[in-house]
Amino acid sequence: MPDRTPDEVLRQTLAILAPGTDLRDGLERILRGRTGALIVLGFDRVVDSLSTGGFALDVEFSATRLRELAKMDGAIVLDRDVSRIVRAAVQLVPDSSIETSESGTRHRTAERVAKQTGFPVISVSQSMRIVAVYTGNRRYVLEGSDAILGRANQALQTLERYRARLDEVTGTLSALEIEDLVTVRDVCSVVQRIEMVSRIADEISGYVVELGVDGRLLSLQLDELVGGVGPDRELVVRDYLEASRYEGPLEAVLESLAGLHQSDLVDLSQVARVLGFSVGGDSLDSAVSPKGFRLLNRVPRLPGAIVERLVDQFGDLQKLLAASIDDLMTVDGVGEQRARAVREGLSRLAESSILERYV
C-alpha cells in the first residue's frame, strides 16, 4: 500500500475491523465457531504469485460466507475494499527467508505474507482464540470493546486535565501579549501544553477507530475537548517564529515538535530549542513580542487574507493595538466597517484577557 506510513495503514485496517463492520462480524463468528482463519486484505500479482491451490470465487463479501469458508483449510483472499471474496482455500507460500518472530504456522505465514505483499493479513488463532493483525512489520492483537473503553475513558480524564491547564496558560499568554510582557518561557509553556493535548487526543482517536460504532460517544467528547487546539498550535508558532530567528519553514517546526520525545517535551528548554530560541542561562526569561496572528484570528468574521495583510503592514501586536481606525483602513481590503470591527474586536479581547488574569 504505497504512500502511507505504517501507523496510517494500521489505523485504516483497524477501522475496517471495528465493531459494527461486516468483517468484524465475520471474525466474531469464526471465533465463536472455534475455528481458525488466515485472511489477506488485498489481491495483486504478488499475492497471486504466493498462492497455490484453492479456487477463485469473486463473490460479494458477507460475514456468513467468511465464516463458512473459514471451515476449510487454506487462506481466504479478499479485495482491498473488503467488498468481495476473491479466493478461498488457498495455500500461501511466502519467502521463507523473511524473518518472523512467530512460532505457529498460521501466524508465521501471516507475518511473512504481510511483509512481502504490503497488504494487511489477519490470523485467527483456533487454540488461543485471538485475532492478530499484521501490517508490514507491525503486529496488533484485537481487543474487546470493554477493554478499549476502559483505557479510552482513562485517557479522556487525562485529556480533560490537560485541556484545563492549556486554557489556563493560553489565557495567561493572551494577557501578557496585551501588556507586552511575554517571555520565551510563556510561549514554550503554551506550545508544550498544546503538544501534550494533541498527543493524548491522537491516542484517543485511535481508540475511537478501534471501537467503531461503540465509540460514537467517545468521539463526541473528544471533538468537544480538542476544539481549536490544532489551529492554535500553528498560530502560536507563527506568532513567535520570526522572534526566535528560526530560518526553516513553519511545517518543519511543527514536525520537530511532533517528533519530540516525551521526556524532552516536559523540558521547556528543549521546546525552546525546537522553536529556534537560544538555550542557556536566563534565555527562557528573555522578552519576545508576537506578530498578532493568534489574537487576530479570534476577531469574528475576519478572513485569513486580511489577517496576513494586517500583520505584514503593522509588524507586531503592539502596533496593531495602537492603530486607529484610519491606520487600519490603509491596509488593502480593509474598509471603515471592517477597520472598526478589528479595532473593537481587539479592544474586547484585550479587556477580557486582562480581566481573566487579574479577577
Swiss-Prot record:
Coiled coil: none annotated. It catalyses: 2 ATP = 3',3'-c-di-AMP + 2 diphosphate. It is an enzyme of class 2 (transferase). Pfam families: DAC, DisA-linker, HHH. One of its GO terms (molecular function) is DNA binding. SUPFAM superfamilies: RuvA domain 2-like (SSF47781), YojJ-like (SSF143597). Its cofactor is Mg(2+). PROSITE patterns: DAC. Keywords: ATP-binding, DNA damage, DNA repair, DNA-binding, Magnesium, Nucleotide-binding, Nucleotidyltransferase, Transferase. Residues 7-146 form the DAC domain. One of its GO terms (biological process) is DNA repair. Its EC number is 2.7.7.85. It comes from the Bacteria. The keyword Kinase does not apply. ATP binds at residues 74, 92, 105-109. Belongs to the DisA family. PANTHER family: DIADENYLATE CYCLASE, DNA INTEGRITY SCANNING PROTEIN DISA. Participates in a DNA-damage check-point. DisA forms globular foci that rapidly scan along the chromosomes searching for lesions. Also has diadenylate cyclase activity, catalyzing the condensation of 2 ATP molecules into cyclic di-AMP (c-di-AMP). c-di-AMP likely acts as a signaling molecule that may couple DNA integrity with a cellular process. Homooctamer. This is DNA integrity scanning protein DisA. It comes from Kineococcus radiotolerans (strain ATCC BAA-149 / DSM 14245 / SRS30216).
